[in-house]
Every structure is written in structure tokens, then in C-alpha cells.
């Protein structure tokens, strides 16, 4: 991809924020226009996150214009909105490689740039990390400023409010910017509100406010009256949210128009010199400046390559995704059972729950970015006699580990976890790979863990988990299913595998959707293939039979080898006193970088060719075949 920089005369001059700060203020609107157009052109040719970045163009320009980055430290929450930040901080020419193998990261990444203060990917971490960074700077008398940018979705998480509460108590100098990108600018975001916000963010108001507090502290009745007066003024002039953040110890300003570059620069210039925790609430429009994205910000959140002129996203006419298979199964169950409840922590579209939410709104809950609450909410529903199904990405279930153990498993409650994005997820990289769920769930008593090899088996396992009356998890990958015929639902025998092919000497014990590679290899190696189905309880009887009748056992999974399904097989062999040679194939002991799924599997030696090479090398080391 090459962008014609003749179309971007100002942007072509910007190779770092230092270059940006050389511009006159009256040049900033043109720069914003060019930056937005460049972002659209780039992402349309490479794929990636689009709508969020389009909405933060003015904010990004204003922040780097006012603050002396990287000396002043700027922290982006999640990172979807940070593409303009990457473009302005020396990575413009590398945008063609974003989310690709060996390319720049889709999120801010410390190893990539000194301007990326915090590596991110998951939500709601910015304020906690920012507070720690601000405290460290304060103790070192560094004189640097700390700014955290968090979205209206991410700030709903409990972790964000824990950090706000702590920051208010410490009274540390830092600025939190709430990027509120609802569908439209609210009524009170206009010239008057911007003017009032400039007054409240100014140094004169701040000095008078702090000085009067010192005096009035000695006269409690007057102090309380003035405090209530100030709160009333802010409540009238600003939004109801101001009271909440003021009570947490922040000086709240806003909401203000996040697309007015002149006002943002003036506001941030004022706020840069204020002491204590500051909170700036800006209103932006997701997809700003590109009509199709403004109309459908969810559809244009993450996009494949597309034609920016037509604005039409390519349709997926291939096999259904595992997410759709799950969503269809959930609808099928809801038609028969009013007690089934579908729950998602802000992943309705990604988890395939759109149709379910529309057809069965009373049986659907989107609890926002609140994974811990999600799991314990499901616990309560189960106690109340309902049948909760938690649809959650593998990487996000990590955030609710204590709730999984303490609230679900210890009480042995019938909560079904539909774990999407298990295994290699591809372009989103290390923060989103579903590499650890088998390992961290396998050690939990009462858990049933299932690994389908295709979409029909996935449906049967979901049904089995729904019917079993215990904590159960079904893990399935991102992307398209195999294309097998779907059969009527029936409960699988728990803890039992199925023998697919009988061979000699080598037995491949498959856990999950790498089964096609195992079957392809079995013909060449005359290997036995078993679809293990259950990681827990594991089929001990089958493992012992295979160990007695074969020279080599090979376990195959898309999970970390350490603590994974292969480790469960090793434990069975050890406890049974079997000495059969065991090769465990899975994800290695490092974080898997971004690449397509096919590229990643090839690099890891988990494609058909790589698996064959690993098996043959293992046997060669053992001495014979």
C-alpha cells in the first residue's frame, strides 16, 4: 500500500509530535482533515479498526500539540482509537503493515515506540496504570504530566472506578479524559458549554477554588455551603455525571465538543497546569467524517479491506462462523426453554448474539465490560433456577478467574461458558490469543471442559453443557466452521472420546479443531486418531488402551502446552505407571504475535506439514518407527 502524500501536504511534514508543535493553531483544522482522510485510505487498504480512530482525530492532534510527548506521558485505553496517534508519532509509513505478521501492532505497544507508554489491548487498564505512572513521576520530581484517555465503554468496568477512587484519594496530578462517543452530540455540547468549561478549567478559577478551600476549611458551615453551591453550578452548567466524578475527588470539566480543535487546545492548555486529579469529559462521534461509519459505527469498528468510495463492506459468503453456530443454537434453545439466559460482557456482535438479543430480549443481558460481574451475575441466576449461558472470549474470561472458582465452581452451579476465540485469533495479536483457558480451567474442581472438532460437535457440546447441571465450558475458535452437516441435538456421554481411525504404533489424541490435520496425517503415518472431546473429565480408559496398544502418543491442541490437555494425558500415564512415549503439541511458552491464523499455525509447526515434521523428529529421537 502506498498513500499519495501529495494529497496530504501538512501531514507529510509530521514525522513526530515535535513537527506537529511547529504548526500554527490555525493550521490544525486542515491537519485534522488530512489525518482523517489518511486514516480512512490506509485502513481501507489493510483492514483494521476504523470508526474509533476517526472519532479521536481532533483529540489526538490537540493532545500532542499541547503536551510535550513523550516527556509527558499519554496512555490510551484498549487502543482501538490510537491509529491517529501512531500516524503522528513516526509510524505513518508503517501503517500498511498494521495487524500483519511482523508489522506494527494494532494497539499501543511499549516495544514499538517511546510514545506508547503502556501496552494495551484489553479495556479499562489506563487509569490504574496512569495513576502508578503519575505517582512515580511525582516521587521523582520529574515534572512530567500524565494523561489517560478512556472510552465510555471501558469506563463502565469496575477496575476503572477502583482507579478513579484511588486517584481521588491520593490527589495526584493527572488528567483523565473520557472519550464519550455516543451516536450524537448531546444538547449541552455547544458554544456556551465550551465557554463555561474554559472558565472552570482556567488557572484563575483553580487558584480561587483552592485558596477559598484553605480559608473556608476553618469555617465549616460556610465551607459546606460553598461546596454545595459549586456542585450546583456544575450540575446546572455541565452534565449530571459531574457530581459522580467530583465525589470521587476529581475536578470535572465537560462535556465539551471533542471535534472542536480550537476549544480542545485551549481547554488542554488550561488543564495542563492544574494540580490534583482532573477529569475532562468530551463528546465525540464514532466514525466522524466518513458517512458510512457514522451511520454504522459498530459495523465499521473493525473492518476488512473495502472500497472507501462505495463504503460497502465485503460480505462473507463462506461457511458459517463458530460464533453464528453458537448464536443459532442459543436461539433454538430459547424457543423451547424460557429459563435459558444469554449473557455477554459487551460482545453481542462478536459472540453471535444479535439475533438472540432481538428475538428474546427478556432472556438477554449485555452487562457491559464487566467480566467479573458477568460470571457472578450468572451465579445468581443459576441459584434462582435459571440456566445462564455466558458468551465470552477466551482472553476475557481470564479477567473473571476468581469468580469462576469462588462463585461458580465451589458451589457446583449449572453455568455454561461458551468460550469464543479459543486458540489462535490472528491479527489482534498477543493480547487476544485464546492460549490459556484450558490450562487455567483444568485445575478447577467440578468443571467440565469440552473441545469440539467441528460445528456439529460444538452444538452437541453446548447442548450437553446446558443439560448437565454442572459448571461446563465449550471452547471454540474464531472464524469459519468446517462445513459438516448439523444433526439433531443429543447429550454426549460426559468424559468419553470417539475413535475415528484405527492405525498402528502412533496414536494422535486430538483436542479441538485441528482434527482435519490429524486425519490427513493419519493416512500417511498409518496412525490411530481419537477425537478426545473432553479435557475434563478426560477419558482415562481410552488413554490407557492407547498406551497399551501403541508405541507413541501425540496430543494435539490449540492451547498452551503447559497445563493444557496434553498435560492431562501425561498425568494419566504417570498415575497409571505407563511409560509410552508422549509428544505434546500445542502453543509454546511465549506470547503469540499477530499474524493470520494460517501464518501463525505454520510458524508454530501446528499446520499439517509442521505436525508431521514434529512427529517424525520425535520418533527419530526415540530410536525407531
UniProtKB/Swiss-Prot annotation:
Q: Catalyses which reaction? A: D-glyceraldehyde 3-phosphate + pyruvate + H(+) = 1-deoxy-D-xylulose 5-phosphate + CO2
Q: Which PROSITE patterns does the record cross-reference, listed alphabetically?
A: TRANSKETOLASE_1, TRANSKETOLASE_2
Which GO terms fall under biological process for this protein? 1-deoxy-D-xylulose 5-phosphate biosynthetic process; isopentenyl diphosphate biosynthetic process, methylerythritol 4-phosphate pathway; terpenoid biosynthetic process; thiamine biosynthetic process
Which class of enzymes does this protein belong to? transferase
What GO CC annotations are associated with the protein? cytosol
One GO MF annotation is:
thiamine pyrophosphate binding
Is Signal given among the entry's keywords?
Answer: no
Q: Which UniProt keywords apply?
A: Isoprene biosynthesis, Magnesium, Metal-binding, Thiamine biosynthesis, Thiamine pyrophosphate, Transferase
Entry annotated with the keyword Metal-binding: yes
> From the record, what ranges are coiled-coil?
none
Q: Which residues bind Mg(2+)?
A: 152, 181
Describe, as the record does, how this protein assembles with itself and its partners.
Homodimer.
Please give the function described in this protein's UniProt entry.
Answer: Catalyzes the acyloin condensation reaction between C atoms 2 and 3 of pyruvate and glyceraldehyde 3-phosphate to yield 1-deoxy-D-xylulose-5-phosphate (DXP).
Q: Which family does it belong to?
A: Belongs to the transketolase family. DXPS subfamily.
* UniProt-recorded name of the protein: 1-deoxy-D-xylulose-5-phosphate synthase
Q: In which organism is this protein found? A: Haemophilus influenzae (strain 86-028NP)
Record lineage: Bacteria, Pseudomonadati, Pseudomonadota, Gammaproteobacteria, Pasteurellales
Report the gene name: dxs
